[in-house]
Amino acid sequence: MFHSIHNVVLERMRYLEEIDAKDREDGTPRLQRLRQIPSDTGRFLALLAANAPLGECIEIGTSAGYSTLWLAVACEELGRTITTFEVLPEKAKLARETFQVTQMGKVVRLIEGDARLHLAQYDNVAFCFLDAEKEVYEECYEIVIPKLLKGGLLVADNAISHQEALKPMLDRALEDKRVDALIVPVGKGELVCRKI
């Protein structure tokens, strides 16, 4: 999977990595920054998604589409698609450009809007990556977990870097008898929940 990533995808990943690094240094306002995952987290997510059961693959928080590309690599390998949600119009526009430039539009379905308004229509969720504003994590968790297939995965970003802000949701997940959960120290910390 990693050895067969198309050059246009790798080029776009590098381009987005450069923008993200610049955003972190030049004082770009927080909501305008890409705030994307590091590449090792992307690889980790792709491996998890590639081993999830057959079902829906969704992402909550697209930004410019960097993490989506990693998930799309896994989905393309398996002949699946991913649906990703982005609430900010300017980031959705950049994500559309990402998927067009990389020719991943056939694998990725971008929905512009609040994921919480759309998640009810998804059953049979095999994999969900949650990387949105921290105040929506707990609500998204409670919507997604009942929709996960047995063996399905919910992965939430920033479980270590934003541990205090996410504490109620993290505590809930780690004690939730519907899932096996742990925090993995990859990137900014990934909460990984597997539906029992």
What are these model-predicted stretches?
Residues 1-127, 134-155, 159-196:
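A short alpha-helical cap/connector motif
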